[in-house]
């Protein structure tokens, strides 16, 4: 079975506080199976003070600019946080396997609360999601973090979007006046477009969700 790409957004993360931090490799942190393939969230150790300062829940994003040849590339990683007050309040400790992505064992980065992230999860591990519909609330375990999320949309393996107002899971060609599936350039425009129904089937590859608390 192919993987589902699950996009998880946190509606409580609106105006994130951003802080410049020093990121260091720590041999206390082991790499997590699947983190390089986007199947699991890597771990970052931080001080309780930094967690409170940034208003974090369970996730942290680190972002920096990396020079690649004559180009500057944005590098961003989402982490599951672990509190360790041996970590200075202006530092974040990560595993060496993740530091490879940044090209250094020590570097400066912007740290902030994660707004959204994507994980690839084997369909066989989410068998309960087949048949669920847009608007349904499901439970996920993301790298040991239990989450309750609401399905808000998705798309199939051809890129056709799911629509909340189309029952079932089959593809249909409909006359649309707005998204998802059609973004009119002028008021009143309508077009026939192919879309998916509101039910998740094995043909769906991306599922969009928001965290429910």
Curated annotation (Swiss-Prot):
GO cellular component, one term: ribonucleoprotein complex
GO annotation (BP), single: translation
Presence of the UniProt keyword Cell division in the record: no
GO molecular function, one term: structural constituent of ribosome
UniProt signal peptide: none
Superkingdom assignment: Archaea
Protein name: Small ribosomal subunit protein eS6
Source organism per UniProt: Sulfurisphaera tokodaii (strain DSM 16993 / JCM 10545 / NBRC 100140 / 7)
Gene name as annotated: rps6e
